[in-house]
Structure formats: C-alpha cells, structure tokens
C-alpha cells in the first residue's frame, strides 16, 4: 500500500522497507544490433534502441514483451554474454565491456535459460551442482557445504545422488537454479525458465524463485511471457520493439489493458475479468490483480445493492 502511495521510485519506500538503493544492473542508453548477411553485405538489425533500466539490490523484477521485443537480448547483456553496440550496461558497478572483469560479473549474476537440459552437464545431481565450483577452485569441504545448502534450498537434497535426466522438467530447472545459487550470486536472471514446463513444474520453479528473493535477498530478474508470474513480482518492465514502454508496480502496469493488448500481450486472468465487468457497467478498481482483491470488491458492490 505504501509503495502505491509513494511510488516505486520514492526514496521513502526503499529506506522504510529496508530495500537497498544499490544498483545491481544499470543500462544507460543501451543499444544493440545483430548483423546478418544480405547480398554480400552485413545488414544491422537494431534490437535494443537506447533503453534505460536500473535494477536495485533485492528487487524481484519481471520483464515482459512479445517475441522480438528485445527482452531476451537485454537478459544476455546482464552477464556479458552480449555487450552493447553503444551505450553502457553496468553490473555491480562494472562496465560489461571490461574484459578483465567478466569473471566478476558472471560470479555475481547467474543465468538460467529455458531448457534445463542445456545447462546440465553431469550424470549425478550433486556433481552437476558442484561443476562450476570445481572450475573456480573452491576447496572440497566448502564445496560440499555449498552443494548441500543449495540442494536443500531448492528442496532437491533427497535427489542428490539421482541422475538429472530421470527427473521432471521442473525438478531439472530447480537443479539448474541450485547450481547457480551455489556460486553465491547477488542476482539471478531467468530467461523464460518455465516456458517448457507443465503447470506443476511452473509452480514449483516460481515458488523457488520467490523464496530465494524473499528469504535470501537475492535480486531476481524474470524474463517471462506468463502474466500471472509477473503479477507476483515487485516490479514489471514491459518492452516492445526494443524499447521500454511501461515500468512500474504490477497493479499499475496491468491496469493498461488496452495498451498491453495492442502490443500482443495478455493480462492476468483477474485483471481481464475486472476489465470485462467494467465494460458491462460495473465500477471496479482497474488496479485489481489478485483473486482476493476481486472477491472483496464484488462483495462491496453486492452489499451496496
């Protein structure tokens, strides 16, 4: 309520609720173009068009957009898989074009992709979680501790001696997340991590992500096309054609139903219901995004009648 009253960027809000104003990711006039051959020439296709995004420590941010909006390209800039064609992106204060600091960036910002099979490299779950730790020379005692803690955190400790390839899609994705958090990152960027999962797998992964943010203070950037996932975050950024068109708390963003539909996006089911009821003559708050809020609003109207 206070966030809505004072606005997402109010210093009051961040100090009052113990949220840091430390910037984890800062994109400044970020532009990026892919080059493709055409009749012997390289043709540039600008995918990011001078975007400005600042993500603070401890935030849980969803980035939405239709295919081709630039959201996944932005995600790949957050740990220097891609670097800007122009403009800057700073991660934990480091310019991602500084080749001498790539290791520091990737230690602090872990990435999880759509298909967990592409990130699983070992035949045993605990060995997979330990893989990156071995590569950076973590001592064996510390490695054992981190692997166990990471698996317990994502509720996969009992599967530590299993083959990852025999697990469900949701379980595999949680193993991938365990491998990331064993590195003790400040931020996790997830690029459509539930796109290939069934509803149960999606729910498990999203609950794990929420827990990492709420209990451990890990900054989370969730690239998704599921509106109901985005509605559970602190902040929603909407991209279209390489630009940022909306950036606010979920209830404020999703109240722009017609704009979102115009760029090919849906809204959460509850928001859609409220929108349709209002078209039929009811006067419900357009910022409603949860079932509880909707039920309470309808009860109030029924009592008045």
Model regions and ranges:
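Helix-to-loop junction immediately C-terminal to a conserved catalytic motif
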Residues: 79
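Conserved ABC transporter NBD signature motif
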Residues: 87-97, 105
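Conserved ABC ATPase signature
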Residues: 163-167, 171
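Conserved ABC ATPase "signature" region
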Residues: 141-159
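The feature captures the beta-strand-to-loop junction immediately N-terminal to the Walker
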Residues: 64-66
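Catalytic Walker B motif of ABC-type/P-loop ATPase nucleotide-binding domains
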Residues: 188-191
């Amino acid at each position: 309520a206070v966030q809505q009253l004072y606005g997402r960027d109010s210093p009051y809000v961040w100090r009052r609720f113990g949220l840091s104003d430390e910037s984890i990711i800062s994109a400044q006039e970020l532009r990026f173009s892919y080059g493709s051959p055409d009749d012997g020439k390289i043709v540039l296709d600008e995918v990011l068009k001078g975007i400005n995004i600042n993500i603070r420590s401890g935030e849980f941010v969803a980035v939405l957009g239709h295919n081709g909006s630039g959201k996944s390209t932005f995600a790949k800039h957050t740990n220097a898989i891609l670097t800007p064609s122009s403009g800057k992106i700073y991660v934990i204060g480091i310019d991602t074009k500084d080749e001498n600091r790539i290791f520091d960036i990737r230690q602090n910002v872990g990435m999880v992709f759509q298909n967990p099979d592409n990130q699983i490299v070992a035949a045993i779950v605990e060995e997979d979680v330990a893989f990156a730790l071995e590569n950076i020379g973590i001592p064996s005692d510390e490695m054992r501790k981190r692997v166990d803690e990471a698996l317990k955190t994502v509720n996969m400790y009992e599967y530590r001696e299993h083959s990852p390839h025999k697990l469900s899609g949701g379980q595999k994705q949680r193993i991938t997340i365990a491998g990331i958090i064993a590195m003790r990152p400040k931020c996790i960027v997830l690029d459509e991590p539930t796109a290939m999962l069934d509803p149960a797998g999606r729910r498990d992964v999203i609950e794990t992500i929420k827990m990492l943010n709420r209990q451990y203070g890990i900054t989370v950037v969730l690239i998704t096309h599921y509106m109901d996932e985005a509605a559970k975050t602190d902040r929603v950024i909407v991209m279209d054609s390489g630009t940022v068109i909306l950036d606010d708390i979920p209830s404020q963003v999703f109240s722009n139903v017609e704009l979102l539909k115009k760029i090919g996006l849906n809204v959460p089911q509850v928001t859609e219901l409220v929108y349709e009821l209002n078209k039929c003559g009811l006067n419900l708050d357009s910022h409603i995004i949860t079932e509880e809020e909707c039920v309470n609003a309808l009860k109030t109207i029924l009592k008045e009648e």
